[in-house]
Amino acid sequence: SKRAQVSFVKNKERDLAVIALLLSTGVRLSELVNLDMQDVNLATRTITVIRKGGKKDVVNIAPFGLPYIERYLEIRKGRYSASDSDKAFFLTTQNKVPARLGTRSVELLVKKLSTAYGKPTTPHKLRHTLATRLYEQTKDSLLVSQQLGHKGTAMVEVYAHVAAETTKEALSDL
């Protein structure tokens, strides 16, 4: 529809930055939508989030996510009528007034863009993807659990299992 096209064009940089940040950090949806401008440090490639249980944590951003985040920041002020008092990192507009992008909006935009790409997914599956790839790359459960903000390494066994399945499939393809 015409409205959907207008929305896509208006929000393209933001939506790609949302997906890039989810994929390049593995943060939870709640951590993403609660990000403020002061929490994002591109110079150090980190974001500061409030984890489950209210604990502050500094999370590294994989380099591939940076160009999308930088592009969004270039258009954020003008496109979303943001002033310095608009602290939310990801914005939408309601009646031309900037507002924090909500969890449901992020779920819908991830679903819409990923479905259009032929790979329907969710914000949590993007977190899972980062964890699996990081584990495959490092085989380091502690490193993966720290990146995801898990208290222990038990949850990482899920990603290790996925990596083992991937290995099995790869061997079958030889």
Predicted segments with their positions:
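Conserved catalytic core of the tyrosine transesterase superfamily
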Residues: 1-174
